[in-house]
Amino acid sequence: MKIMEIFEFKGNGVKKLFIGGLHGNEGKFTEIILKDFVNSLKECNYIGDIVVIPKLVENSKYISTLSEKYYESDEGKTLINIIKKYKPKVYFELHAYKKENYKKLTSNNRKKVPPLIDIGNNVLIASISPILRKRFSKEDFCMTIEIPSWKVYEVKDEILKILKIGAESLRREEIIEKLKKIYPEHIEKAEYFSKKYNLMLF
C-alpha cells in the first residue's frame, strides 16, 4: 500500500477523524473534497484535535465495509489501527459511488442495513458499517457520506458544509441538531431507519 497523507490540526478537546478512499479507486474522488477541507480548516474555527486522511488507499480490491472480510484485509486492518491510535469521538467516512449503483445504495431491500439517504443532488448519508460502529461508543458521532463520483465538483461545497459542522461542533448532539436545521426531513428519516433496524443514528 502507498503511504497515505495525514493532516493533523491540534486543538483542545474532542478528537475527530475525517477519512476517505477506503477501498477500490474511491480515493481519487474523496481526496478532492478532503484536501479542500484541509485548506478550509486553516481558516475556520474548528474545535478539538482533527486528523484528515484524504485517501486511505490509492487503489485496491473492492471489499464492502459491510463485510467482515474488509476488516481482515490490509486496508481494513490499517483503518482499525488508525482508529485505535487517534480514538476519535467524531468520525466521518467518505466514499464515492457510480451512477449505476444509486438504486442499490438507496434501496429499502439492503441487507441488515437501512438505505442511504439522499440529501439532495445525489449526496448520500448514513451511519457507518455496524461492524465498525461497535468500536465506537454511543456518545460518539459516526457518519458515512457517499459522493456521486460523476459530479464530485458539483457537490463539493455541500459536502464541505457538513464536514465543517463536524469540525466546529463539540459533541454528537450538537452535530445532529445542526444537521436537523439544514436537513430536517432527511434526519427525521435517518432517525426512523435507525429505530427500525435497531442501529445507532450516526
Swiss-Prot record:
Name of a matching Pfam family: DUF2119
InterPro entries: DUF2119
Domain of life: Archaea
Name of this protein: Uncharacterized protein MJ0501
